[in-house]
């Protein structure tokens, strides 16, 4: 199929339901970013940014009705397919910081997990091999064009050269959990020999500058002297 070119793309009313576990979601997206979703437990609309909810509104009952329809349809399709399960795909994860890393300055780590199918996954943050729950937020499942899903998990943190981080991904398509490692890249300190060489080069450049400057001054004085002509007595 030919791709359709557009300046902006809105995906409205994406409904997902699967069993077992009564897992479902209803989302709205714009240009690949989540706008809002309906929380099944709280039965309310959750906006990605609170400011969005001040501009417009969405009745969560509409999303809950769509999910109920998805649940009913899934039961019919399961019987027709003789309960044949979907193929599990292996997701792919990448970890990167939101902003350039400066030690001691607050930042956010992002774990981007793509090619998720079916949309059931556990994403866990580890700091120095220990689970971290404070400062963690993740999006709902966002739809890809090939009908797989992606999800982002965020961790607010303060970079330190003593800490290392891992994003742990667990999914039915993986034989074992996948750990994506991240740690701040700290420039290695210069050795004494390197510092000595740098200082020597700096001193040499300075001396050359002094010599060249002195030569130019002398030449300038000589040129000024030869250009003078004695006046009449």
UniProtKB/Swiss-Prot annotation:
Residue ranges, annotated region (Alpha-1): 1-88
PROSITE patterns according to UniProt: IG_LIKE, IG_MHC
One GO MF term: peptide antigen binding
Alphabetized InterPro entries for the sequence: Ig-like_dom, Ig-like_dom_sf, Ig-like_fold, Ig/MHC_CS, Ig_C1-set, MHC/Immunoglobulin, MHC_I/II-like_Ag-recog, MHC_II_a/b_N
Alphabetical UniProt keywords: Adaptive immunity, Disulfide bond, Glycoprotein, Immunity, Membrane, MHC II, Transmembrane, Transmembrane helix
Residues annotated as transmembrane: 196-221
Domain Ig-like C1-type: 91-183
Signal peptide location: none
Family matches, as Pfam families: C1-set, MHC_II_alpha
SUPFAM superfamilies: Immunoglobulin (SSF48726), MHC antigen-recognition domain (SSF54452)
Topological domain ranges for the Cytoplasmic compartment: 222-233
SMART domains attached to this UniProt entry: IGc1 (SM00407), MHC_II_alpha (SM00920)
Sequence segments annotated as region (Alpha-2): 89-182
GO BP term (any one): positive regulation of T cell differentiation
Cysteine pairs bridged by disulfides in the record: 111-167
Extracellular side: 1-195
Lipid metabolism recorded as keyword: no
Region annotated Connecting peptide, chain positions: 183-195
PANTHER family assigned: HLA CLASS II HISTOCOMPATIBILITY ANTIGEN, DQ ALPHA 1 CHAIN, MHC CLASS II-RELATED
Protein name: H-2 class II histocompatibility antigen, A-S alpha chain
Source species: Mus musculus
Gene name of the encoded protein: H2-Aa
């Amino acid at each position: 199929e030919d791709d359709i070119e557009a300046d902006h793309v809105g995906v409205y009313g994406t409904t997902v339901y699967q069993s077992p576990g009564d897992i479902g979601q209803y989302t709205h997206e714009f240009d690949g970013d989540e706008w809002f979703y309906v929380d099944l437990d709280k039965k309310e609309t959750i906006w990605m940014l609170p400011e969005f909810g001040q501009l417009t509104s969405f009745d969560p009952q509409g999303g809950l009705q769509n999910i109920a329809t998805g649940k009913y349809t899934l039961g019919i399709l399961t019987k027709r397919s003789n309960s044949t399960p979907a193929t599990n795909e292996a997701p792919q994860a990448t970890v990167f910081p939101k902003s350039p890393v400066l030690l001691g300055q607050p930042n956010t780590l992002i774990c981007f997990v793509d090619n998720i199918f079916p949309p059931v996954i556990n994403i866990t943050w580890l700091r120095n091999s220990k689970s971290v729950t404070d400062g963690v937020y993740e999006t709902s499942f966002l739809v890809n064009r090939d009908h797989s899903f992606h999800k982002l998990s965020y961790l607010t943190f303060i970079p330190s050269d003593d800490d290392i981080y891992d994003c742990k991904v667990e999914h039915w398509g993986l034989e074992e959990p996948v750990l994506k490692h991240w740690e701040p890249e700290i420039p290695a300190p210069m050795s004494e020999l390197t510092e000595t060489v740098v200082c020597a080069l700096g001193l040499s450049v300075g001396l050359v500058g002094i010599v060249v400057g002195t030569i130019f001054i002398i030449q300038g004085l000589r040129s000024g002297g030869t250009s003078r002509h004695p006046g009449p007595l």
